[in-house]
């Protein structure tokens, strides 16, 4: 019984995460990597492995803008968090 509940909770948690990402498509986000680098841009795609595609991406290190990219692909195993930002 406990295993079923845990599986159900895990499934519900995954659905909530997927719905959050779906809501963020086309919106500004901040993605922070495990190494401390932040990417700010428009979220285009997130897959089940947390691989991320962004447009109009800016790379920040220690709060300072380092580079601007048109398109950016971030590998999911490097992602620490994704934060939705207010529309500009």
Curated annotation (Swiss-Prot):
InterPro entries per the UniProt record, alphabetical: Lsm6/sSmF, LSM_dom_sf, Sm, Sm_dom_euk/arc
Entry keyword annotation includes Ribonucleoprotein: yes
Pfam families assigned: LSM
Record keywords, A-Z: Cytoplasm, mRNA processing, mRNA splicing, Nucleus, Ribonucleoprotein, RNA-binding, rRNA processing, Spliceosome, tRNA processing
Sm domain segment(s): 16-88
CDD domains from the UniProt entry: LSm6
GO molecular function: RNA binding
Compartments where found: Cytoplasm; Nucleus
GO biological process terms, semicolon-separated: maturation of SSU-rRNA; mRNA splicing, via spliceosome; tRNA processing
Main location: cytoplasm
PROSITE patterns, alphabetized: SM
GO-annotated cellular components: nucleolus; P-body; sno(s)RNA-containing ribonucleoprotein complex; spliceosomal complex; U4/U6 x U5 tri-snRNP complex; U6 snRNP
Record's subunit section: Component of the heptameric LSM1-LSM7 complex, which consists of LSM1, LSM2, LSM3, LSM4, LSM5, LSM6 and LSM7. Component of the heptameric LSM2-LSM8 complex, which consists of LSM2, LSM3, LSM4, LSM5, LSM6, LSM7 and LSM8. The LSm subunits form a seven-membered ring structure with a doughnut shape.
Family (UniProt): Belongs to the snRNP Sm proteins family. SmF/LSm6 subfamily.
Function noted in UniProt: Component of LSm protein complexes, which are involved in RNA processing and may function in a chaperone-like manner, facilitating the efficient association of RNA processing factors with their substrates. Component of the cytoplasmic LSM1-LSM7 complex, which is thought to be involved in mRNA degradation by activating the decapping step in the 5'-to-3' mRNA decay pathway. Component of the nuclear LSM2-LSM8 complex, which is involved in splicing of nuclear mRNAs.
PANTHER family the record matches: SMALL NUCLEAR RIBONUCLEOPROTEIN F SNRNP-F (PTHR11021), U6 SNRNA-ASSOCIATED SM-LIKE PROTEIN LSM6 (PTHR11021:SF1)
Protein name per the record: Probable U6 snRNA-associated Sm-like protein LSm6
Organism encoding this protein: Dictyostelium discoideum
Organism classification: Eukaryota, Amoebozoa, Evosea, Eumycetozoa, Dictyostelia
């Amino acid at each position: 019984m406990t295993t079923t509940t845990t599986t159900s909770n895990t499934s519900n948690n995954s659905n909530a995460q997927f719905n959050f990402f779906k809501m963020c498509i086309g919106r500004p986000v901040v993605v922070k990597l495990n190494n401390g680098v932040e990417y700010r841009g428009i979220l285009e795609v997130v897959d089940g492995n947390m691989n991320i595609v962004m447009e109009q991406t800016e790379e920040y290190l220690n709060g300072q803008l380092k580079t601007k990219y048109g398109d950016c692909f971030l590998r999911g195993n490097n992602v620490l968090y994704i934060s939705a930002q207010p529309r500009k």
